[in-house]
Amino acid sequence: MTRPVLVLVHGWGCDSRTWQPVLDGLRELVPVQLVDLPGFGNTPALETFSLPAVLAAIESQLPERCVLLGWSLGAMLAVQLAARLPQQVLGVISLAANARFVASDDYPHAMAPDVNRQFNSRFAEQPQAALKMFTGLLAQGDVQERALLKQLRTQVPDAINHNWAQALQLLAELDNRAALVQLSQPLLHLLAEQDALVPIAAAESLRGLNSQHQIHVIAGSAHAVHWSQPQQLISAVQDFYETLATAVDKKRVAQSFGKAAATYDSVAGLQRAVGAQLLDYLPAQLDRTRLLDIGSGTGFFTAQLATRGAEVIALDIAQGMLDFARQQHPQAADWVCGDAENLPFAQSSVDFIFSSLVIQWCARVPQLMQELARVLKPGGRAYISTLGPGTLVELKRAWQQVDNYVHVNRFVGRTSLEQAVQQAGMQCLAFVESTRRLYFSRLRDLTHELKALGAHNINPGQAQGLTGRQRLQAFSLAYERERSPQGLPASYEVYYLVLCKP
C-alpha cells in the first residue's frame, strides 16, 4: 500500500526552505510535499491572513491522503486542518508547538502576553531587527547554540509583506485546545527541551487535552528542532509512519462488525466459550455496582451481566451491533456507541469493566489501557479476554506461501500488553494463556465463519481488489498441508486478564 504523502508546513518568519536539513532523509522514507504559507516563500500574499483563508489556501494543495508535519505556527495550522479533514489528514506530527502560543488565565504554560506584544510591536516598527532577534530565539538554549545560530542566519528571508504581521496576530489569537480534544487521528507532539518560545511545561497541558496523543521531548534542542536534531526528527517520522501502517482502521472495524450483526450469533461458538470462561472470573453478585461492557456486540453477555445485579452500560463501536442488541435485550443496559480508546465516560465512574475478544481490534493498546484506568474507580477491576499473535497461525502460514500481503490481523503479544497495563498505573492480578483449536472439513467453512463474524482481515497492507483465482487455488493447496485427522485446524491464542486500579 502506498504510504500517504508527508506534507511539510513551515512556521512564521521563514518558508519551505527551512526543511533543508531533513528533506533528503524524509524523502528516503515517504513521499514528501512542501507547502509555503500565503505571503511566505513563493506563495502570493492574501488580502487578509485570516484562519479560514489560510486553511483554505493550504487545503487546496493537500493530496487525497496525507500526514501533516508542521513546525510552530505550521503545526498549529496542521491541527486545525486535521480537525476539519479527518478523512484526508491521517495523522499529525506537531513540531515545537503549543495548544496556545500565548498564555491566558486558563492556559498559563505558554509565552507571556507582554513578551508577545513587545515582539509584535518591534516587528511592526523595525522588521529586520525583529527578525534578527527572532533568529536568536530559535537557537537560544540549544546545546549547539552558536553553530545553530550561524546556520539559521543564512535562512532569513529578504522579502516581507503585510501577511507577516497578520500571521503574528493570528499566532497570538489561535487556540487549538478544542481541536486537540476532538482530534481522533494519531498525533505526535515533538517538544524541544530548551525551547525559548514554547515552554517545556506545555507537555503536561497537552497531555491533559487528549490522552491518545503522544508526547516526546527532544533533549538539548532549541525551537529549531529540525536544524538542531535532524536525525531525531527523521527517526520520529519513520516511527510515526510505522504506527500508521499497523493501526486498525476503526471505521472499517465498525462497518465490518455492524454488517455481521444478524449472522454473528449463529457462528460465534468460540466467542461464546471464551466469554463464558471470562464470566467465571467475575463476582457472582454485582449489586449496587456500575459495570461497563466494552464491545458488547449482540448483547449476548450484556444480558447475562445484567442478571448479576449491576447497572450495565453496553458500549460498541458498531452502530449496527447496538441496534441489533437493543432489539434483542431492550432492558438489559444503556446502549452507547463509542470508541474504547476514547471512552465517553467520566473519570472514576465505573466499578467493573468486562470486555471479551474486543481489544485485539484496538490500534493503540497503551491509550486503551490509559482509558480503562481513567474510568475505573479506585479498587475497580477490569476483566478482559483478547487474542495473541499465535491466532490463525495456520492461515498465516498458508498465505505466506502465496504472497507477501497481510491476510491475518496482527495481534499484540503478552509483553506489550503487560507493559501497557503497567504504564497505565494498573496491576495485573491474573494473566492466563490458553490455546483453542477449531477444525473445519472445508476451507470455505472457515472463511465463511470469519466473514459471518465480521472478523476478516481489516489491517492495512492487505491485497486490494479481488483475489485472483490462481492465488486462491495456491492458498487452498497450502492450507491443505495443515490438515489433520480432525480436519483443517484454526488455532486461537487466547489471553485472559484481570486488572485492578489501585
Swiss-Prot record:
The keyword Hydrolase applies. Pathway: Cofactor biosynthesis; biotin biosynthesis. The active site is at S72 (nucleophile), D195, H223. Residues 225-502 are annotated as: Malonyl-ACP O-methyltransferase. Its EC number is 3.1.1.1, 2.1.1.197. Pfam families: Abhydrolase_1, Methyltransf_11. The keyword S-adenosyl-L-methionine applies. HAMAP family: BioC. PANTHER family: AB HYDROLASE SUPERFAMILY PROTEIN YCLE (PTHR43798:SF31), MONOACYLGLYCEROL LIPASE (PTHR43798). This is Biotin biosynthesis bifunctional protein BioHC. The gene is bioC.
